[in-house]
């Protein structure tokens, strides 16, 4: 299908998914890189690896232990090569201000050391106000804009545009537990505002969400062409 961003596994358990020293996720990223290189039909196909870790990296290294977390992110960067890596929710500091400070601190450490891994704000970044707060403080490199949490398409649009204005990555996300209609509405918002990426939804089987979202994109383009 040539998806621009690879769907991620659920890295939501230290013992079973991340590994006590992060070894399981590292092995998974290496496997994913090797598999894409083996199966792709075109060497120019370079998808982004976007992996939500549900705060587990902070759980093993410490939510504000930036040097240790950055060391591990550098290992993941190497494992993902030649593909670009995004890590969503590296830590969960259990309250909004501390989460912002931790993501800001980790971004500064990663950027200072030239580690080519993007950090995506997830935990404690839910409402339009939250998105602006994280973007203003450069807490991470990108925000997941959780479409159901924002309360209206006006807020979804404003959140994406605000992130772009601030030079902060905009990931128009949401949840797999949505409907085909909400996904179609979100696609229209995304086609208008141009976030960096959009979640293929609903469902966790990949194909159904990808088809619903991609078909709506094609429908918008076809209608636009017909009206010219």
List PLM regions with ranges.
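Catalytic core of soluble alpha/beta enzymes
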Residues: 4-6, 13-192, 197-216
């Amino acid at each position: 299908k040539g998806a621009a961003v690879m769907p991620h596994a659920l890295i939501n358990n230290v013992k079973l998914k991340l590994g006590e020293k992060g070894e399981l996720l590292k092995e998974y990223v290496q496997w994913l890189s090797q598999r894409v290189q083996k199966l792709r039909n075109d060497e120019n196909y370079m998808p982004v690896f976007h992996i939500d870790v549900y705060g587990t990296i902070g759980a093993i290294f410490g939510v504000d232990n930036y040097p240790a977390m950055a060391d591990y992110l550098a290992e993941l960067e190497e494992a993902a090569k030649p593909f670009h890596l995004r890590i969503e929710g590296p830590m969960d500091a259990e309250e909004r201000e501390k989460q912002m400070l931790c993501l800001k601190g980790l971004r500064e450490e990663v950027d200072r050391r030239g580690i080519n891994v993007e950090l995506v704000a997830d935990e404690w970044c839910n409402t339009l106000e939250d998105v602006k707060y994280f973007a203003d403080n450069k807490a991470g490199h990108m925000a997941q804009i959780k479409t159901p949490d924002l309360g209206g398409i006006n807020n979804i649009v404003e959140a994406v545009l605000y992130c772009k204005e601030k030079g902060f990555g905009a990931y128009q996300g949401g949840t797999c537990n949505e409907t085909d209609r909400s996904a179609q509405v979100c696609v229209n918002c995304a086609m208008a505002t141009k976030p960096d990426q959009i979640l293929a939804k609903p469902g966790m089987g990949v194909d159904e969400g990808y088809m619903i979202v991609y078909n709506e994109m094609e429908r918008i383009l076809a209608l636009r062409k017909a009206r010219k």
